Amino acid sequence: MGEVAATVEPLAAVKSKSMRSRKRRQRRRRQIAYLAICGLSVAIFGFALATLIRPTTAQADADPGSWRKGYVGHGTTHEQLGQPHWPPVQYTVYRPTTNYTKAPPPPTSAMNPIFNFTHFLYDKVLYRDEPIPEGYIVVKNSDTLSLGPKVEENDWRDLLAHYWMVLIWVVILVVLIIVIPFIAVCYCCFCCCRRCRQGCPPCTSKQDAQRRFCCGICLLILIIGLIFGIIIAFVTNKMIDSGFAETSETMKRGSEDTCTYLKDVADHVHHLMMYNYEEMETHVLDQLTHAHRHIFLDLSDTSESNSLAEMERVLENMPEALELMRQVEKMEKDLRFYGSQLRDGVRGIKRDVNFAVANLCQLQMCQKFLISSNIEHIDSSQCLHFDNLPNTKEFVEGMENIVASEYYAIPQRGLSRLKKVSDKVKTQLSFVVPPMMRDLTKGRTIFREHATNVRNIVEGVLSDIHIKTLHSTKSFEDVYERFGHDRNVVSLIVCLLILLVLFILIFALLCGCFGRRRTGYGDECCSKSTGATCLLLAILLIFCVFSFIALVGLFYFMLGMVTYQGACAPLRDQENNTLFRQLDASIDLNHYLPPSESNKEVVQPLKMSSAIKACHANQTIFDMMRQHNIYDINDLTRIKVMSHSQENTDSIKVFDEDLSTVVLLTKEERDELKTAGESKLAKYHSSLYMPSLCTQFTPMNLNALSEQLYKLSNDLEYPAYGWAKVSFWNEGLNTKAFYRNFVPKLTSLVEKMKANLKKIDELISYENHDFTNTIKILTATAINSEQFIQTRGKDYINALGGNLTNSIDQMIDDYIDMIIKEANESVGHCAPLSYIYYRGVDLICHRIVDPINGFWVGILLCALLFLPILFVAHRLMCLYKKIYPYLATVGAAGVVEGGSDYLYDAYSERDREHVPLANVPKKRRKAYERRREQQDYFEDASPSVSRGNRSGGDRGGGGGDGAPGSSSMRYNDMAPTHWDHEPPRYHNPPAAPPSSEYERPPPYYYPGASEQD
């Protein structure tokens, strides 16, 4: 059972393998069948495609667009060189010669930060979207700004209500203007200027010095602020005067520059629309006038009928070539004669040298010379063998036969027949060209009208802008008329008052800093007492002028704010400023412009703001006018100069003659040309002569060979080789003689023959062919040209005529495009216009309004600085008025701090001075030294001398309270009532017993020279 199962399993495996192989074969058959079907489908598709392509190919072959094999376009030679078929117009470029007037130097730039501050104040702090209330700025004659009636009436209620921050500021100033005079009255009536607490000057000396220093620094800072304010006031006041004075000059410059700008625009437009059109017209008229010649030449070039002209050139040059060939024949004979003589001569030299080497000189030197000199091949040069030269006589006979037969008349007759085709072309074009010329003349009139219209429009726009500029320079003239005369006087008074206060304060500060302290004993000039007096004077003067100065500053502040909102703010914020929108609405330029015939509708008004914006963008005047529908230069593209451009140019036929009967060469003429090509001249070409026409007649230079022979002769010994020596010497002479007599002649003959042959080739050859091929090629080309003219000449001429009309239309379109491009990019840039306009605006805003605002900044700055100056000056005045006595007693009059019995030491606050006499003036120091010599200044300090004796000796006698024996002597002021410039003496108390020991004296008070704090 197991064996049967083992046998069944292999059989099943074999059966499964056979089934798989059968399936693979079936799959392969299906793939082959599928590929066969696909291949058959591709073959059928290819056959069908071939049948479709064949007619298309035939049509392409018949397409007249390929006029000449291997050439593109119309088959002309100049087109293959990259040159246009009809050359374009070369326009001259406009060169401006404008010179604008020079603007005056700008105002000082040192005030720019002040002006920028006022701009920031008005633009950022006080900025409002709503315009200023009515009645403060009015528009006169729709173009000039002036102050309104509310300014004349000093009615500022609406303005202050509109700007609440301005209201607060004005209220503060008004309160100060009113209150300060009352404070001044109280200050003077209650004697505040004299109520300065003295205190204890010796006790508070150090603190007083510190207070003086701090107050002095504060006053110095305030004085610097005053200086800054007065400088601003003076400079801006001068700028206001200059701004009002430059009005007429600025108007004159603006008029001149506007005229210059207008002339430049007009000249540029005239150059584009008149001068450049005339250039284009002249160019097109020239092409139309010579169009028949151009078309005929292109027809000759494409049909290759120029071969007749080449044939005529070849045959007409035959007599000249004949003369040259006869010269070549004569030179050939001379060449053969002289060449044979030279050849025979060098052969004799070779024979004699070989004989001498073989028989007369068997030395190694002679054998070596024979080998190295190459003399064995001296006569083997091809240039000496003229057997290969052609027979020139046959060429001469062939030329004579051609000249005698007058073959040159054949191409001349063909050219005369071809000229009839040119006459037909000229006749046909005479019906087409005159209308084109009339259209060009009419186009010149059209562009002249457009140039005049454009000039009028531009002149109207510029005139209006210039008028607005001139009127804008008159803005706020009423400011000068109303305040101009008194304003300058008032401003000058204010500046002088501030300057007076400034000088007094500076002088007071200098006296207080460098003057002596007040002592109460006859103070000198320029001391601190003088400084206190000057400060008091400054305080009183400030009280007197503060209200006046602040009132003037307030007036300028209000005036500057109103004028700024009318002149500068509109230019600052043209989009958002409502006042400018209100003013801009009344400035319309359209009523100055000429009426537009092409646009009968009411165009949108051109605003000054739009003009300014265009100038900012550096646009041209044509861009600005196009954007506002005044004039669009792009409308020139609608102009149709040529009337035929309205039609289909493909249907235009400029030539309608039958050229099928044109014959260039008859059958007889062709036979004659064939006979001429097969004459004796048939094989002529200069290349037949060139292999034999060379100048290397010998392998070596004969002169060099003669020198070698001389050298060899000199090297041989005599008399052993005497005959060889003589032989070599003679051969050297012969070699030199042959070179001198034959080589130059032969060389000259060869060069002349080459030149003649080259000239003959140029005369009777075509494209470097020999004569027979030249005649054959030119004849065949003429025959093909004849067939081209007969079959395709008419279509070719019409194609060139259509190309001419298209080229003229393209030239006119290019001209119009050039005008539009130049007008939009180069004509009338707004930069000069902006320059002209902003010079007028500069007169108002930057030269009048800004200085007004700068003036109130300087004035109010000084006025506000007066307030802290009052306080600081009063404090400093009290410090300067303190009296510092020489001695301060201790006891009944007042005990010093700590209850010390010693007197007050004046040097406690003088750390920097240890020697009292250091600061004593020179006069007093000398007087003191003289008195010291007279008195015993250095007393005996020994114990034997009692203090009482010493003091008694110094003091002398005396009575009263000051006597030495007085009981109250200790509490009396020991200093003299009048200081005599001597150090004070110190005494023992009356009750003190005499002491034999040395005792240190108590501190003493010695004022010395007055300190300068």
Curated annotation (Swiss-Prot):
The keyword Glycoprotein applies. Residues 918-1013 are annotated as: Disordered. InterPro entries: Prominin (IPR008795). It holds the Pfam family Prominin. It is a multi-pass membrane protein. It comes from the Eukaryota. The keyword Isomerase does not apply. Its main location: membrane. GO terms for biological process: microvillus organization. Residues 950-963 have a biased composition (Gly residues). The chain crosses the membrane at residues 32-52, 215-235, 489-509, 535-555, 852-872. Belongs to the prominin family. This is Prominin-like protein. It comes from Drosophila melanogaster.
